[in-house]
Amino acid sequence: MQPRASSDFWARYRELPANIRGRADKQFALMKDNPQHPSLQFKQLGDRRGQEIWSARVTLKHRALAIKRRDAFLWFWIGDHETYDLMIS
């Protein structure tokens, strides 16, 4: 399944510190090779408005969110765990 990212995702990505962007790059590369790798904690959170929402760990304090499409995951958000918790609750 091909990953894609929204313009909002890239805007948030560019706002992250360089070390977090580097970690995100490593995690997304790992996801392409092995989406089931335990360090990703890649999981479906549920359905919202008929769309599957998925989460992946970037660091202990950062997460990324995607919507599953037929042939791809569309990554739409990346950021700190506190904001992530608010978004998924």
Model-based region annotation:
Residues 2-7, 11, 15, 57-89:
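Enriched for short, Lys/Arg-rich terminal
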Residues 15-18, 33:
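Secondary-structure boundary motif
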Residues 30-56:
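A short, surface-exposed loop/turn module that caps and links secondary-structure elements
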